[in-house]
Amino acid sequence: MQGVSRTSLTEVIRRLDDILPSANTATLGHELFEVVALLDQEHSLRRWLADPAGSPDSKSELVNSLLETKVSPATLLVVSDVVRAQWSRPRDLVDAVEQAAVLATVAEHASARELEGVEDELFRFGRIVAGQPELRAALTTDGASIEHKRTLVENLLSGKVSTATLTLVTEAVTRPRGRTLEQGLEHFSQLVAERAKHYIAVVRAAVPLSEAQQSRLQAALTRIYGRDIHLNIEITPEIVGGLSIRVGDEVIDGTIAGRIAEVRRRLAG
């Protein structure tokens, strides 16, 4: 998000933080995800609610009339805050509701360590899916119903991960919102990391890193980015040696395979 949407999102999250202590956060997260699904489906409603020329009071009144008997008061407050705000694009409005849903879902994991646990579970599930094409196909095929996919996720993860992780994986699988499964899992992971006040570095290495190597890398990246760094490490033998590090959209490629590819590009040029 940029400009006015970024400012509005900051205010929505600030007001959400005031609501969370007295709310049933699991219910709040679930209901907000349902609102996301509604807004994604109802294009005209989404555009009308995001229209900067519209009256905030009128938007809030419409939301109240649509949702008052269907969701909790806490959910109604959050959605009302979102529709009263100004957004650059209709998509930004829905993304704000989705981010509020994610934060409500992980609200019981208050400490940075607990939030890192959710990140790790999302990352590990993403690696499992990437390594099992048949499982990925079962989770992403258009031919399977949402209920079938939801049941599959529950059978795979129930009792093995936190309730928050199970909820977020289920959302990424059943309502991808135009993202691939991997993109959805990474998006939720980034939102959790932002909540924990740190960045995620996805590190690809040919062999496992020792604890000492991980600590040194973490410290070096923290100095570079000026923020705590959480490492997600992928073992990728085909890179031969060295490391590839991705933080957000920035990639540091120090792999041998990367250097060979660069030499080949130069020779070809």
From Swiss-Prot:
GO terms for molecular function: proton-transporting ATP synthase activity, rotational mechanism. It comes from the Bacteria. GO terms for cellular component: plasma membrane; proton-transporting ATP synthase complex. This is ATP synthase subunit delta. The gene is atpH. Keywords: ATP synthesis, Cell membrane, CF(1), Hydrogen ion transport, Ion transport, Membrane, Transport. It comes from Thermobifida fusca (strain YX). It is a peripheral membrane protein. Belongs to the ATPase delta chain family. F(1)F(0) ATP synthase produces ATP from ADP in the presence of a proton or sodium gradient. F-type ATPases consist of two structural domains, F(1) containing the extramembraneous catalytic core and F(0) containing the membrane proton channel, linked together by a central stalk and a peripheral stalk. During catalysis, ATP synthesis in the catalytic domain of F(1) is coupled via a rotary mechanism of the central stalk subunits to proton translocation. Its main location: membrane. It is found in: Cell membrane. F-type ATPases have 2 components, F(1) - the catalytic core - and F(0) - the membrane proton channel. F(1) has five subunits: alpha(3), beta(3), gamma(1), delta(1), epsilon(1). F(0) has three main subunits: a(1), b(2) and c(10-14). The alpha and beta chains form an alternating ring which encloses part of the gamma chain. F(1) is attached to F(0) by a central stalk formed by the gamma and epsilon chains, while a peripheral stalk is formed by the delta and b chains.
